[in-house]
Amino acid sequence: MEGSSAGQNDFLEPGEWAAWTALLMLHRTVLQDLDAELRREHGLAVTEYNVLSTLSNAPGKQLGMSALAHRAMLSPAGTTHLVTRLERDGLVKRSVDPADRRKWFTALTEKGDKALQAARRTHSRVLQRSFLAVTSPADRRLLRQLWQRLSQASPGAG
């Protein structure tokens, strides 16, 4: 990465380090592009979009808070803070789990579903421009296979 010292990658070959930093830079760039356009066009941060999308794909469009945090790849505290903002804006609603009153569910509201549908067009457009337009179907198959292997090899996989 920019400004990295030689000591930061003493255990990696230059090509290994370059591959790693290229992946990080691509990820950061695409997320920044998504975040900027989602905020400008829909008033949603990319993390908010991700939570709405995660809820939309869940059974009954609702999840417990810990499941939502896990699936959205957020910390529990970050999820609580984000859900509070989304609830204030009427995009989600929280309710107590009737089976265990210590737990909470978060559900996508109709307003949240409409906001998500509108934002999905922007999300798709950015991904088309920054990823799909510059990769072939064969490239994407290869990347998908590679990412699956990397995910399975990760200690936190599963």
Kindly give the residue locations of the regions a language model identified.
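N-terminal leader segment of winged-helix/HTH proteins
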Residues: 1-42, 89
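Short, hydrophobic-biased segments on the C-terminal half of alpha helices
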Residues: 65, 83-84
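C-terminal regulatory/oligomerization modules of transcriptional regulators
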Residues: 1-14, 137-158
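N-terminal helix-turn-helix DNA-binding core of bacterial DNA-binding proteins
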Residues: 32-75
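Short, locally clustered residues in the helix-turn-helix/winged-helix DNA-binding domain
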Residues: 24, 28, 53-57, 120
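N-terminal positioning helix adjacent to the helix-turn-helix/winged-helix DNA-binding module
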Residues: 15, 47-49, 111, 139
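Charged, amphipathic alpha-helical coiled-coil/dimerization segments
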Residues: 2-7, 84-141
